Swiss-Prot record:
Chain residue ranges for the region called Disordered: 28-114, 142-188
Protein known as: Uncharacterized protein C2F7.07c
GO biological processes: regulation of transcription by RNA polymerase II; transcription initiation-coupled chromatin remodeling
Gene Ontology terms: cellular component: mitotic spindle; nucleus; Rpd3S complex
Organism of derivation: Schizosaccharomyces pombe (strain 972 / ATCC 24843)
Zinc finger motifs (PHD-type), residue ranges: 263-312, 406-459
Extent of Basic and acidic residues compositional bias: 90-102, 161-174
PANTHER family reported for this sequence: TRANSCRIPTIONAL REGULATORY PROTEIN RCO1
């Protein structure tokens, strides 16, 4: 039995200890009297020394037992209340069998303690002190188990006084949850009086009693009820009520956490600026992107909700929406169409029109900007920012290149010292003065876009759009393909090939040999046409080609511009002069030699 301080014990326990002390003192007095009486008998009866030790022990035990039963109670003043003399209750049946008493010694204290333990366990109507509560009432084994698990502080324990079980019923849990919900609803008022289904609500746990295999346990069920109280107080209440649930089940999932911030971009146009934020979802809108628009000076004083949240508040359940649509379909087809359109407008937030990604990114080098405008991505310039240039790579006052050669204008062959500015082409190595261009540039072009000089003919020739993800087809029979201008030469392959791009979004890879044959075929056709021209009007050809005698004395190639001027002098012979121009370009004409006569030129190029 556990030791317990004397001032912390009950009065009944102290009375039992005092009674034990009284009995022990009486037993000690009887022992002293017995020892003195035995010495007198031994002196008077000397011939009886042969008495056995066993009979002597039995006589001593019987005399001691009789002395204990026939003794009178002593006064309380003779008792000693010190803790050193506290002893257990002594049974009056005497010593056990086999025990013996030595001379001048009574029953030992250890034997008395053993007898006390046996008598406390077997004596009827006696209750041990550790089986009583603080109010001296018997404890049920279930209560004792619950007392060890959940010890209560203080002496006022109503559950132990009434001997009730600690198992909470479903009715008690429902009363607790209803009272806490009333307290939370009275503490704060909702901002919106409609039927909004708040996404930011924290699920309120409700406990239910489930019985499995005669074992009752509490289970927490999360519901979608609106919770308007303080979050920290609500979570503390839930942890206090749900005792049999682990801490992981009390915490909400990441999907159930409330929205802390709204979007930092407009949900309609995806642009930055000042927004009007919804109270139940993370959507944000410009004041002009809302339907209907709102002026910045006339903002709503109350909470504002977007169209989707308002629609969900009116039609919270899907059955109501389906029933409404079924009623509309019965009225007529036209009404059904308009009703669906109006319902779609009211239930969705406005979105700015923009081309689908499949259309805006179909062609190579074409894209859309932040606001949906058309831009050419291949013209944009990717700048490498640095501390010295601050993102500007174009220097209009360059005098020398990286290799040390002087930078001169392509047209006037002068440096930047003359006009104080010069432009570098982003597609070739030529430089131009802004005043030498036709028309002249008043300001320098932007650093974010590439600039192309007039030496390139892209601004004159028709521009073809190349598909970004075109289907590549290997042509099995390359015959029949002709040069139509939309050709890309692939120089990376081992065998030279030509890719022809058509508008159907397909790339046909053709060897270069058919195009060479087509080019030679065009030359033969031009030679035949030249012979026919000479046969029909020989004098006209002589007058036309006589104008080339001026260039025969000069050490320079025949410029194409002058050939075009010659063709413009006689509009009737444009076709023949252009054919002659093509022949002059492909012929092995030496600039040091005079221009051949038309007949010699025809014979030279004939096969």
């Amino acid at each position: 039995m556990d030791a317990k301080p004397w001032n912390h014990t009950s009065e009944a326990f102290q009375a039992s200890i005092l009674e034990d002390l009284k009995i022990i003192q009486k037993a000690g007095a009887e022992r002293n009297a017995k020892s003195s009486h035995g010495s007198i008998n031994s002196r008077s009866a000397s011939p009886n020394k042969a008495t056995s030790r066993r009979n002597r022990a039995q006589n001593g035990n019987s005399n001691g037992r009789a002395s204990v039963d026939n003794s009178d109670d002593g006064s309380k003043d003779d008792l000693d209340y010190s803790p050193s003399v506290k002893r257990k209750h002594v049974n009056g049946e005497g010593a056990e069998k086999g025990d013996h008493d030595t001379s001048n010694n009574g029953p030992s204290i250890t034997k008395l303690r053993r007898k006390v333990r046996r008598t406390y366990d077997t004596k009827d109507g006696f209750v041990a002190w550790n089986t009583l509560d603080d109010d001296f009432r018997p404890i049920v084994p279930d209560q004792e188990r619950s007392r060890k698990i959940n010890p209560q502080k203080g002496n006022n324990n109503n559950l132990l006084k009434e001997n009730k079980s600690l198992k909470t019923t479903a009715k008690d849990l429902s009363d607790i949850s209803s009272s806490s919900m009333k307290k939370a609803n009275n503490s704060s008022k909702p901002l919106f009086s409609g039927k909004l289904t708040f996404k930011a609500n924290i699920p309120v746990p409700t406990s239910e009693v489930v019985t499995e295999n005669n074992v009752t346990r509490n289970v927490t069920v999360y519901s979608n009820q609106k919770h308007l109280g303080n979050e920290s107080e609500n979570f503390n209440d839930m942890e206090g009520r749900a005792e049999d649930i682990s801490s992981n089940e009390l915490l909400p999932t990441p999907e159930e956490y409330p929205y802390r911030y709204n979007n930092d971009y407009c949900s309609a146009c995806h642009g930055p600026g000042n927004f009007l934020c919804c109270e139940t979802c993370p959507n944000s809108f410009h004041f002009t992107c809302i339907d209907p628009p709102i002026e910045e000076k006339n903002l709503p004083d109350d909470a504002w909700y977007c169209n989707e949240c308002k629609h969900h508040s009116l039609y919270n359940e899907l059955d109501e929406q389906e029933e409404l649509e079924s009623n509309v379909k019965e009225e007529g087809t036209m009404v059904d169409v308009w009703m669906q359109l109006c319902t779609y407008i009211d239930s969705h937030n406005p979105i700015q029109f923009h081309l689908p990604h499949s259309i805006s990114s179909f062609f190579r080098g074409v894209g859309s900007g932040v606001m949906g405008e058309y831009i050419e991505t291949d013209v944009l310039k990717h700048l490498k920012s640095s501390r010295r240039s601050n993102g500007e790579e174009r220097d209009p006052l360059l005098l020398k290149s990286k290799s040390g050669t002087p930078i001169l204008c392509f047209r006037c062959h002068k440096s930047a010292l003359v006009s104080q500015s010069i432009l570098a082409c982003d597609y070739c190595n030529s430089y131009w003065h802004p005043d030498c261009l036709n028309p002249p540039l008043a300001t320098l072009p932007s650093n974010l876009r590439k600039w192309k000089c007039p030496n390139h003919s892209d601004h004159v020739t028709p521009r073809y759009r190349l598909p970004e993800k075109a289907k590549v087809i290997r042509v099995g029979l390359p015959r029949g393909f002709k040069n139509k201008g939309n050709i890309v030469i692939d120089e990376n392959e081992d065998e030279p090939s030509v890719q022809t791009i058509q508008l159907q979004g397909k790339i046909r890879v053709v060897p270069s040999k058919p195009f060479k044959l087509n080019f030679l075929e065009q030359i033969r056709d031009n030679v035949i046409n030249l012979r026919k021209m000479v046969e029909q009007d020989e004098q006209l050809c002589i007058e036309t080609f006589s104008k080339f005698d001026f260039y025969a004395t000069r050490d320079c190639e025949l410029p194409l511009r002058i050939l075009c001027d010659v063709a413009n002098d006689n509009l009737e012979n444009d076709d023949y002069v252009l054919a002659l121009r093509d022949l002059l370009r492909i012929s092995k004409w030496d600039p040091n030699q005079p221009v051949p006569a038309p007949f010699d030129l025809a014979n030279l190029l004939s096969y």
